[in-house]
Amino acid sequence: MRTDYCGAINTRHLDKTITLCGWVHRRRDHGGVIFIDLRDREGIVQIVCDPDNVAAFQIAEKIRSEFVLAITGTVRHRPEGTVNHGILSGEIEVLVNAIEILNPSLTPPFQMDDDNLSEAIRLEYRYLDLRRPVMQRNIRLRHQVTMAVRIFLDQHGFIDVETPMLTKSTPEGARDYLVPSRVNAGHFFALPQSPQLFKQLLMVSGFDRYYQITRCFRDEDLRADRQPEFTQIDIETSFLPENEIMGMMEDMIRRLFASVLDISLPDPFPRLSYADAMFLYGSDKPDLRVPLVLTELTDLMQDVPFQVFRDAAQKAGGRVAALRVPGGGELSRKEIDEYTQFVGIYGAKGLAYIKINDLTKGIEGLQSPILKFLPESVVQSILERTQAQNGDLVFFGADKAKVVNDALGALRVKIGHERNLATDSWQPLWVVDFPMFEWDEEEKRWQALHHPFTSPSQGHEDFLTSDPGKALSRAYDMVLNGMEIGGGSIRIHRQDIQSKVFQALNISDDEAKLKFGFLLDALQYGAPPHGGIAFGLDRIVAMMTGADSIRDVIAFPKTQRAQCLLTQAPGAVEEKQLRELHIRLRRTENTNN
């Protein structure tokens, strides 16, 4: 039916008779000649319907937007002055010999070139939204990414192995999606949050290099850019230390960006410890495009009269830090108030500042409500440490370290981009040496910072029982432009160490055996040292395409309320289906009636 793609036609096809199939992007009637922009996945070509061809012209008069057509015609040069350099086929046009309407179309609810559509309309008519060139490009680039990954991993001896989609619920962290079993009444499968345990079992089984591009599921409260089902590039390997795994994986990402975007990423990627990342950037996923850093001031503030700073400096786990904003002296009171409101989102109770007007005048050359509470020697030390210059502004954070890091870390990125201080570049790095655990104030117990199968750093095994807060892990995260795109670790391959981690997490032996007994058993049968990583495919593709949301790089995504506007899922089911599954719904009464 078709000899060529619309977007692939160019001057090489001159004087050839071709057959094209596609959708009517636009139809124009100019002085009795009908022009049709015909679109397919490769692009657009201009079709010319001359009234001398009566049969074809009569059909062309009936054609409207989004009709799907088959057209046979002859390729010719466009007339002088009508060349369109904005499209690949812009030097030629196709003079119609014959047209067939393969299927008409209702009037679409939106134009395919409308860039101001509401997301609700786009998702409701996703099959039309996906026709838009930008969505075609996004989904095809996603395909290029997965193909590049598969080729790289195949070349490095990795085997694609599928793991179960129906598995056991082990609720740690996010909630599982549960699937009732009809044949095992009262029992439920869970959809996997990751293939973590199965890929470790594959290492025990001797498949020493595994990968899978797989769907994962988390029934969590959706944040701005999360999906209940998402895609991971899941990788595991045996007998390699973390340095070799990290080297191989950054090589894969470098090749990916080179082949898909023709972009050269640094070689090697910088590495930063978790402690240094928090100290300098207030974040374990720092955006290195922003050149600003935090400056430590806790030691300076131990005895200052300013109580807000002094209390934070003296309390265990407190921090006082500064953020210098080059040229920030021009910020208005209104802008400073807006930044103060912004850091409040992260728990900060205020945002003190000093404007540097003229360093040669000493204190008189500074402007701030807090100067009267700070000794001149302390102010001088602040200026020296921050390397403040005339015209700069220094913001301060003083609170628990987490609040200061979260608030100033987010403010650093916001100011960096809003004030055009960030570079237009790709800045990857590895963050390493994470703590094994973090303390949960609500539950009053330790929780795994990554997951409970992460190996402690060498020499830190004894901390698991004596002082879990001191234990570091063999975890590593790949960060790109302030986004975590991959997270991995060396896993625990000894049953005794795994049991100690469960104990540190307050998981009893009985609970561990019930949830993870199969893993604990497997570790006793010659489990090899192993480790791996999982990359977020949706996130990587969104960054590569410049999409505002991962929903723009997923063919059929859910909304922020975990709903599919196209199919109206999730939906109610018939009572008969519930009975077959041995499920009875408990309906809550409306107490307002």
Swiss-Prot record:
It catalyses: tRNA(Asx) + L-aspartate + ATP = L-aspartyl-tRNA(Asx) + AMP + diphosphate. Belongs to the class-II aminoacyl-tRNA synthetase family. Type 1 subfamily. Residues 196-199 are annotated as: Aspartate. The keyword Translocase does not apply. Its main location: cytoplasm. GO terms for cellular component: cytoplasm. One of its GO terms (molecular function) is nucleic acid binding. Keywords: Aminoacyl-tRNA synthetase, ATP-binding, Cytoplasm, Ligase, Nucleotide-binding, Protein biosynthesis. Its EC number is 6.1.1.23. The record marks H30, G81 as: Important for tRNA non-discrimination. Gene3D superfamilies: Bira Bifunctional Protein, Domain 2 (3.30.930.10), GAD-like domain (3.30.1360.30), Nucleic acid-binding proteins (2.40.50.140). One of its GO terms (biological process) is aspartyl-tRNA aminoacylation. HAMAP family: Asp_tRNA_synth_type1 (MF_00044). It comes from the Bacteria. ATP binds at R218, D219, E220, Q227, E484, G536, L537, D538, R539. The gene is aspS. It is found in: Cytoplasm. SUPFAM superfamilies: Class II aaRS and biotin synthetases, GAD domain-like, Nucleic acid-binding proteins. L-aspartate binds at E172, R218, H450, R491. Homodimer. This is Aspartate--tRNA(Asp/Asn) ligase. It comes from Nitrosomonas europaea (strain ATCC 19718 / CIP 103999 / KCTC 2705 / NBRC 14298). InterPro entries: Aa-tRNA-synt_II (IPR004364), aa-tRNA-synth_II (IPR006195), aa-tRNA-synth_II/BPL/LPL (IPR045864), Asp-tRNA-ligase_1 (IPR004524), Asp-tRNA-ligase_1_N (IPR047089), Asp/Asn-tRNA-synth_IIb (IPR002312), AspRS_core (IPR047090), GAD-like_sf (IPR004115). Aspartyl-tRNA synthetase with relaxed tRNA specificity since it is able to aspartylate not only its cognate tRNA(Asp) but also tRNA(Asn). Reaction proceeds in two steps: L-aspartate is first activated by ATP to form Asp-AMP and then transferred to the acceptor end of tRNA(Asp/Asn).
